[in-house]
Amino acid sequence: MANVESFDLDHTKVQAPYVRLAGVKTTPRGDQISKYDLRLLQPNRGAIEPAALHTLEHLLAGYLRDHLQNVVDVSPMGCRTGLYLAVIGEPDEEGVLQAFEAALRDTATHDRPIPGVSELECGNYRDHDLQAARQYARDALTQGLKVQKTILLQR
């Protein structure tokens, strides 16, 4: 099986909440696509409830695009401790951190309907929790986000 970057990360040594450059891929045409680990919870110490994570995905998909250019995708992690961000190019981690903080501030105060929540727009439109999503955003902001360097497993 192909190597998976996140399986080489020492999850016991990172300190959430954080932003981490998880990798950069070069397309056949030479474009760069950067993947960022946007971690809200400490690995193996908790998990975001699925409805809250689904709402975070919807809100951050829009709000991150408001604060950062060339966003390709925002996707929840299977472990439910954060999300991945894919961006064209190689924005510096500090710039991604600032955009993530701004998007979390927007999420923490979001008081309108959740975007993309209808049977036509979403594959599981009933599974959302705005209040919990707002609380996760507030908690991460209160704890203070930072840039986390990749710490590889010693094998």
From Swiss-Prot:
The enzyme's main class, written as a single word, is lyase
Entry binding sites for Fe cation: H54, H58, C122
What is the recorded function of this protein according to its Swiss-Prot or TrEMBL entry?
Answer: Involved in the synthesis of autoinducer 2 (AI-2) which is secreted by bacteria and is used to communicate both the cell density and the metabolic potential of the environment. The regulation of gene expression in response to changes in cell density is called quorum sensing. Catalyzes the transformation of S-ribosylhomocysteine (RHC) to homocysteine (HC) and 4,5-dihydroxy-2,3-pentadione (DPD).
Q: From the Swiss-Prot or TrEMBL record, give the protein name.
A: S-ribosylhomocysteine lyase
> What are the protein's GO molecular function terms?
iron ion binding; S-ribosylhomocysteine lyase activity
Q: What cofactors does this protein use?
A: Fe cation
| GO process terms (BP) | quorum sensing
EC identifiers of the protein: 4.4.1.21
Q: How, per the record, is the cofactor bound?
A: Binds 1 Fe cation per subunit.
Superkingdom assignment: Bacteria
> NCBIfam families attached here?
PRK02260.2-4
A Pfam family per the record: LuxS
Self-association and partners: Homodimer.
Name the UniProt key words of this record, in alphabetical order: Autoinducer synthesis, Iron, Lyase, Metal-binding, Quorum sensing
Please report which protein family the annotation says this sequence is part of.
Belongs to the LuxS family.
Q: Which residues form the signal peptide?
A: none
Q: What SUPFAM superfamilies does the database record attribute to this sequence?
A: LuxS/MPP-like metallohydrolase
Gene for this chain? luxS
Q: What is this enzyme's catalytic activity, as reactions?
A: S-(5-deoxy-D-ribos-5-yl)-L-homocysteine = (S)-4,5-dihydroxypentane-2,3-dione + L-homocysteine
